[in-house]
Every structure is written in C-alpha cells, then in structure tokens.
Amino acid sequence: MDRKHAKNVLNDLLVVIFNQILSIEAEALRKQGVTLSMSEVHVLEAIMKTEEPNMGSVAKRLRITIGTLTTAINTLVKKGFVTRIKDPLDKRKVLLKLTPKATPVMHIHDQFHEDMISTVIKDLHIDQNEALIQSLESLSTYFREKF
C-alpha cells in the first residue's frame, strides 16, 4: 500500500471508529435508561477524574471554555447529577461534585469502555497489543502537542 492510500485509509478508519464509539456508547446508555448526552457524560467523567474539580480545571481537562462548561454544569445541576460546593480551604473557589445520581451513569460508562477494550485486545498477541498502544500513544501525543 502506498503512503497516500495508507493515509486515506487511516483517516477513514479514525473518523469511522470515533463516530462508532460515540454512537454505540450513546445507544448503550439509552438502553440503560440514561437520558444524558455523550457530552454531558464526558463532563461527569472529567469531574470524577479531576483531582480538584473546579470550573477551570475541568474545562482545561475537556479542552473547552469555562463558558461552555458553565452551560453544561448548569444543565447537570438542574438534572441532579452535579452540585457546586464551596472549597473549604478557599471560599472563593467553587468545586464540582457528582451526586449519587451520577454513580450508575459512570458505572455504565466505565463498563462500556472496559468491554470495548477487552474486545479490542482479546484476539491480539502481546506484541500486537504493544504495537497498538505505541501507535495510539504517538497519535495522542500528536493531538496534545498540535492542538
């Protein structure tokens, strides 16, 4: 396969895989009764995975503006998935906290990713796993540095 054809195939694969993951996960969440959008689920995930989840740190993790995050957080607060609490150490700061209502959503989300990765690596040999990881790390580094 020549380089130009390989680039086209790789581009097509990345676009298709990205879209498939989002749509399949959205469907899996809907089947479990979750009415949140994938964007809202990813905001919940970012809050859960951020050490000190304030507006700035969560927006940075998601690579969105604080204004965009504010809109999402307002919706998630109204839906009962997130609360805002004053930082006990610095009253000027507002921390974001998931409510118990978010726990099953995060469990479904995590289980989807666990199943997806298990399926991807199930038939790969160790050297293929390592090659896949190395390729994806290179791709991730490119996106992180370029954008």
Regions picked out by a protein language model, each given a short descriptive name:
Residues 1-34:
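N-terminal leader segment of winged-helix/HTH proteins
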Residues 14, 40, 62, 73, ...:
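Short amphipathic alpha-helical/adjacent loop interface patches that line ligand
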Residues 5-8, 12, 17, 111-147:
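Terminal interaction helix/tail motif
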Residues 23-65:
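N-terminal helix-turn-helix DNA-binding core of bacterial DNA-binding proteins
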Residues 75-131:
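Charged, amphipathic alpha-helical coiled-coil/dimerization segments
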Residues 19, 23-26, 78, 122, ...:
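Regular, well-ordered alpha-helical segments
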Residues 55-56, 67, 74, 94:
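Residues within helix-turn-helix
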